Amino acid sequence: MQDMMGGFFGLELPEYGNFPYPESTCCAYVNSGRAAFECLLQNMPWPERIWIPRFICDTVLQAPQRLRIPVERYGINEQLQPELPPAGRNDLVLLVNYFGLSDLSEAAAQLRGRCIVDATTALYTPPLPGVPTFYSPRKFCGVPDGGVACAPFPLHQLPENTGSSSRHSLHLLQRLEEGAESALAASEAAEHQLDNRAGRMSRLTRQLLGSIDFSAAAERRLRNYHTLHQALGCINRLNLPASPGHAPMCYPLICGIPGLRDALIDAGIALPLYWPEVIGQSTACTTENKLARSLLPLPLDQRYSFSDMERLSRLILE
């Protein structure tokens, strides 16, 4: 529908047009990462089971549960690499690219096409050849909704949403005007709304994604990663690449310094726990439990400069 000419002004957004995954018949724009996962499952041969790692957010289980696909769980090692399960020829395996730093090419080759890649924390890593992959731009930039499903075959689109994303965009404006802490409750409410409705990506999110310079954001993320790794690589128990091939979501640090998480939070560094439900579902000796308790996802995104990374490194090392 053509918009009205004249009248009050709306948001005036630049148009960079370099979002990594343009919409196409094989790339569906939906309103969340879990909706993108569901979109892929609906467009693939129905599996007898799907294997999902234990080290993952519980929301990923919503899609197979809604589609009544039986779920089995499998483990990963201490370097965030999959320990492939005994999947049958009619099973699917969900591989997770953790923070954009996992190399899944060998695992995908072993599975011979019986896999989907969860790249919700790996926006800048393109799909492996022939492997369906889904993304969550909301973890990388300020948009109210959004998920992307990419496949080596045409995808049937989800239905249009009946509501407007403006109702769950409040947290973005609130953070801008009042700060992050004031917007936490609104952010959690917006997340809950996305749990209950799968549909297409909103017009607002499409416009906002077009207004972000993703190339510049990727360069900033890589520079910040290099700064952190140069300072912290010597204490990090994770064997991370010195120069990752694609821009990561964060710098995952495991170092065993007592009280470090609380000290950083007290210093104003937001450190989400990936993932708290894993701790309650596993014993203390499991790899997943240890990762959930000890992994510190240090922020390195496009909002921050070299001096910010130096300050963060000093807080940890001093």
Model segments located where?
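Short secondary-structure boundary/capping segments
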Residues: 85, 107, 125, 243, ...
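Short, charged, surface-exposed secondary-structure boundary motifs
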Residues: 80-85, 124-130, 142-149, 282-285
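A short alpha->loop->secondary-structure connector
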Residues: 115-116, 133
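Active-site PLP attachment segment
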Residues: 130-175
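Short, acidic/turn-prone active-site loops that include or flank metal/cofactor-
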Residues: 56, 75-81, 119-122, 137-141, ...
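PLP-dependent aminotransferase-like
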Residues: 3, 7-27, 35-110, 114, ...
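PLP-dependent aminotransferase class I/II
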Residues: 3-10, 17, 21-28, 33, ...
